[in-house]
Amino acid sequence: MERPALRVNLIFHDNGAGLSADAMIVASVLSTAGIQTTSSPYQAPPAWDRAAARVARWSGRPRYDLNIFLEHVDHRWWPMARRSMLIPNQEWFHPEWTRRLRGFDRVLCKTQYGLRIFQSLGARAEFLGFTSEDRRLLPGLPREEGVLHIAGRSLRKGTVIVLQAWQQHPEWPRLTVVQRPPQEGYPLWHPPLPNVTYHSHRLSDEEIRELQNRYWLHIRPSEAEGFGHPFAESMSCGAVVITTDAPPMNELVRPDRGILVPAHPTEPQGLVIRQEVEAPALEAAVVRALAMPVSEREEMGGQGRAWWETNDRAFRSRLKAVVAGVG
C-alpha cells in the first residue's frame, strides 16, 4: 500500500525579500520529492485552531507531519504537527527564543558558522546548507566593464563605504547601485558622482537579473548574513564577488572564487557581531579586481559557478533526506 504524501507546514514572514525567497526554495525542493507544503504566517494560529490541533495530536492525527519554521520561533505552532524543525538566521535570532530551542526536533543550520552557534546553545543542530535561485541567463553572455552593488532595502550591505571608495576614484568604471529606502521617506546617502548610477526605485526581477548578468564584478560587503543569498546569486551568474572576510560571508566566498576584504567588529545583532569592511582594504580589493586579466576573471567566475552547482545539489539532497526521515 502506497504511503500518503508527507504534509509540511512552512511557517514564515512573507516579507517579499529573503524569507520569502527561502520559503520558495524550500517548497520547490520538497515538491520535486512529492511532498505537499502549506504556507502559514509566522504569527501564532488562532486559539481555537491551536485547541483543535492539540486534540488531533493527542489522537495521533495532527494536521501536518512536519512544521518547518523559517527564522521566527513561536512554540504555539508545535501542536499542529508531529515534528517541528527550525531553519534559523543567527543574525535575526532573538535571545528570548533560546529557551525554546530544545522543543525543536532539529535545528537545521544554513552554514557551519550557524551550526557552531546553535550547537553552543544546546540545540539539536545539524548542517543543512542552503542555496539560492539560479540567476544565470546564458552561459558565456558578454560582460560589460562595470561594477554592480545590490543592497535592496538593507542598510547593512556596506553601501556607504562602497560609495566613499568611488568618491575617491573618478577613474574607476561605472558603479551601478541598487538600493531602496528601508521605509518610505528614509533619506539614502546617494552622492552625485559621475561614475555611479543609482536605482532607488523598485526594479523588476527581470531587470535585476539582467544587471546581475551584465557585470562581471559584484561588490557585496555585507555586515552579517544568515546564509548569503547575495553571494550565491552572484556566483550562480559566474561573477567575481568582493565581500567581507568574516563568517559566514567567507564560508561561501573563498579566495579561489572571490576577493575577501578584512573587516572589524562593530555592533551586536541577534547572536552575532556585525562586521564592517575597512575602507583602504576595500579600495585595494577593487584595484586588484580591476587589474585582473580577462582569463583570471573568467577562471574565478567559473569556480564560483562550479561551487554554486555543487552546493545546490548537496542542499537539495540533504533537505529531501531530512524531511523524508520524518515519515
Give each language-model segment a name.
Residues 240-243, 248-253, 259-260:
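Short hydrophobic beta-strand element within catalytic cores of glycosyltransferases
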Residues 277, 290-324:
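A charged, aromatic-enriched C-terminal amphipathic alpha-helix characteristic of glycosyltransferases
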Residues 185-209, 217:
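Nucleotide-activated donor-binding/catalytic signature segment of Leloir-type glycosyltransferases, i.e.
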Residues 96-97, 126-146, 187:
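Acidic anion/phosphate-binding donor-loop and adjacent secondary structure
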Residues 138-157, 163-167, 175-176:
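Conserved donor-binding/catalytic core segment of Leloir-type glycosyltransferases
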Residues 223:
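Aromatic "clamp/platform" in nucleotide-sugar-dependent glycosyltransferases that forms part
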Residues 1-70, 317:
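N-terminal pre-catalytic "stem/leader" segment of glycosyltransferase-like enzymes
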Residues 40-117, 121:
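Extended catalytic core of nucleotide-activated donor transferases of GT-like folds
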